[in-house]
Amino acid sequence: MNKDDCILFSGGAAGAEQAFGEAAERHGIEEVNFSFAGHNIVRTRGLRVLNHEELASGDVSLEYVGRLMNRRYTADAPTIRRILQTIWYQVNNGQEIYVIGTIQDDGSVRGGTGWGAEFAKICNKPLHVFDQAQDAWFTWNGTSWDRREAGDGPVATHIHITGTGTRLLQPNGRKAIDDLFERSF
């Protein structure tokens, strides 16, 4: 795969998205960060501010997302809604999805990042999660998570990848991102 053809889709937020962007930049990978007016982000390379019509294209029912992820979202949470809409763009544009976070007992991923993982499942896209608490990569097989053995981390095989995850990035999560880019590019 020619890295000049590759694009990382992310959101530019502090934590995992910042680390994905930094790794992409170090490896000469183009970067697109989806955001919205007024959103606090730290990565501005490849910034794509979505307008109200574009955000509406990625709109999802907070009730549906809440049921899917066993969580409650209030309908009057415009910032949460916009964040979920930008995550829709990240996953929709990526052919392969990489997430840094925590897989919960119900199989969902904790936090807003979880919507990205669930949407990737719905879209049947290759999905890999680095669970910081378990210090391991997991790959979604269509029905459950398969734990990857140490030394068998995923390798990007598509030119359009999505990198997202927790704001609370731990050193092992950062290393997982760096190692992913080293293996892939």
Predicted feature descriptions by range:
Residues 2-185:
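Acidic/glycine-enriched connector segments
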